A protein has these predicted regions:
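Conserved beta-strand positions that form and line the central face of beta-propeller blades
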Residues: 73, 164, 255
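Extracellular "leader-to-stem" segments immediately downstream of a signal peptide or signal-anchor
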Residues: 1-78, 82-96, 106
Length: 325
């Protein structure tokens, strides 16, 4: 009941913010920044000609983010209101979010990013930077760049069991130098896009499309909370996606779990101290490029069980088809 009430209220607030943002999004679409909510293949989303920033790699490296848009400065640590991080995220139009404050932003409800073309530049914060705590941060759009941020979901409102950083992402997503911990479902997950086909692009009423053109690099997913016997690291996947130079540490499972078929690129990562699952998921159509990763058992890893030596466990039985190959 608490969860339903909170999410009903937050969805209403998010819808109100989206109603204000949408005219700006549509205006900019006519000026060359299209809003493509129905994207389900990598080529559905235009990409930039130069990387999002020096050092960007992988499928999301050509995300536009907020390039060329307005600069919005976060001036306080409030949950909502003028100058807040939430208000900047919910604003319409291409935008680059910078900070002149440092500290912990304690959320009372999830932040839902619905307007595309945004760069969140956590490295602009002074001091020890910015931490988003107490609730989830959701990306429900495309062309998003998030750098140098900390997401600490934490054991608050335990009846709302969700990720520290996740959402319903469409594509052109670049995550770099972020730290995601204390999730109640997973710490950070990007793998699918649930699409409402009201725009008429598809006929189906219930579509699960891949997230496309995604990179997570130089990022930490660690110490998921075991409140529900569900201390999991990540579910990742999609089309034209890459996950490199990341650390998964002290999560019982899903380090990470592969949440889509096709090609899964997993390179130069470290996985430490898993319990009953290291890396897993996908199905018999998945193709895994797992290159130069370091798996190190820790104090919680079983020493006398095959899971302690396991690198990957594909889940062939997940397929809903009536045949196997």
């Amino acid at each position: 009941a608490n969860y339903t009430k909170m999410m009903t209220e937050e969805r209403k607030r998010s819808d109100e913010a989206w109603e204000k943002a949408l005219p700006i999004v549509l205006k900019e679409a006519k000026e060359g920044r299209p809003y493509i909510s129905w994207a389900g293949r990598p080529y559905d989303l235009p990409q930039a000609r130069i990387p999002s920033f020096p050092g960007a790699e992988g499928g999301g490296m050509y995300s536009f983010g907020g390039r060329g848009g307005k600069v919005i400065t976060v001036t306080n640590l409030n949950d909502r209101g003028p100058g807040s991080f939430r208000e900047a995220c919910e604003t319409g139009g291409a935008r680059i979010i910078v900070f002149n404050v440092a500290g912990i932003i304690r959320l009372e409800s999830p932040i839902i990013v619905r307007a595309p073309y945004v760069t969140i530049a956590g490295q602009t914060a002074p001091g020890d930077g910015v931490c988003i705590a107490g609730e989830s941060f959701w990306v429900d759009t495309h062309d998003v760049v998030v750098r140098h941020m900390r997401f600490r979901r934490g054991e608050t409102k335990v009846w709302h069991r969700d990720d520290s950083f996740g959402g319903n992402p469409i594509g052109n997503i670049m995550i770099d130098h972020c730290s995601c911990t204390w999730g109640l479902d997973e710490n950070i997950s990007f793998y699918r896009h649930m699409y409402d086909p009201s725009e008429g692009q598809y006929e189906s009423k219930d579509l699960k499309l891949p997230t496309v053109n995604v990179t997570i690099q130089n990022t930490i997913s660690a110490k998921a909370l075991d409140t529900y016997n569900h201390a999991f690291g990540s579910t990742l996947g999609g089309e034209n996606c890459a996950f490199m130079r990341n650390l998964w540490a002290s999560n019982s499972g899903r380090n990470p779990s592969v949440g889509w078929n096709g090609v899964f690129n997993f390179v130069n990562n470290v996985v430490f101290n898993w319990v009953h699952r290291s890396s897993d998921g996908g199905d018999y159509t998945a193709m895994f490029n797992m290159i130069n990763n370091y798996y190190k058992p820790g104090p919680a890893t079983p020493k006398n069980n095959t899971v302690g030596c396991r690198i990957l466990k594909p889940e062939a039985g997940r397929s809903k088809l009536n045949y196997k190959v």
